Amino acid sequence: MKRVFLFLITNLAVILVLSFSARLLGVDRFLTSNGLDLGMLLAFAALIGFGGSFISLLMSKTMAKWSTGARVILRASNEDESWLLNTVRQLSKKADLAMPEVAIYEGAPNAFATGPSRSKSLVAVSSGLLRSMDRKQVEAVLAHEVAHIQNGDMVTLTLIQGVVNTFVIFLARVFAYALDSFLRRDEDESGSPGIGYWISSIAFEIVFGILASIVVMYFSRKREFRADAGAAALIGDRRPMIEALRALGSIDAGKLPKEMAASGIAGGGMMALFSSHPPLESRIAALESAR
């Protein structure tokens, strides 16, 4: 969940900055100078949407380290760190990947993988995960994260987010223009849009962005099943991954970070639509039924 959450937050921030910069440069004024030019607007939305998404991807590893306080293991200082490095190295070799950076951060049981490409990636595990699981289970979690890198999930997420961003920016400005035109219906509409357009376009971007995250989260849940299967393939046995998921499910939900509710520990109903992970029971069932 952490890698997806960080990506979405970074993406939203970048999009808002790019959109605001475009306003300062007069792009919106140009698009609406003779009525709303939908063709030009779509091109502008795609440029900002995909640009923001790829900027977020390039920043993903740096943001992850900064937000978690993760410490990259450059040289093992104890037996646990040595085991972590060797395990990730072996799994990466099996996955035909370059050795990713390996980091540890303080926190409740969790792990994530991120990075702009398969050759420039990061695998991070929390101290809580290392304390609460045995090594076979931790190896399965590491294999799951390596499988995310092998499957190119961050790049896939970036492309999906780029498409979503494009429609969010496009629709936000269409709705904002319509609202501004309605508010100014008794005035001279030959000039540039009024203050209603500037305020409402930002508001619509935020609201549509939150709603559009449902689409991104849906694809994220699908990729989790693939990463589970990939972990089983890398280890050569699905049982360690199943045991790791069961161990995660047995941990007191109160001891988990809030984002781990998305892994199926807690939550449901409408909130499940905003979850980046399927329920643990569904993931275990998928592994057990795999052949």
Swiss-Prot record:
Task: One GO cellular component term, please give it.
Answer: plasma membrane
Swiss-Prot/TrEMBL GO biological process terms: proteolysis
One annotated GO molecular function: zinc ion binding
UniProt cofactor(s): Zn(2+)
Cofactor notes: Binds 1 zinc ion per subunit.
Q: How does it sit in the membrane?
A: Multi-pass membrane protein
User: InterPro entries this protein is in?
Assistant: HtpX_protease (IPR050083), Pept_M48_protease_HtpX (IPR022919), Peptidase_M48 (IPR001915)
Quote the protein name from its UniProt record. Answer: Protease HtpX homolog
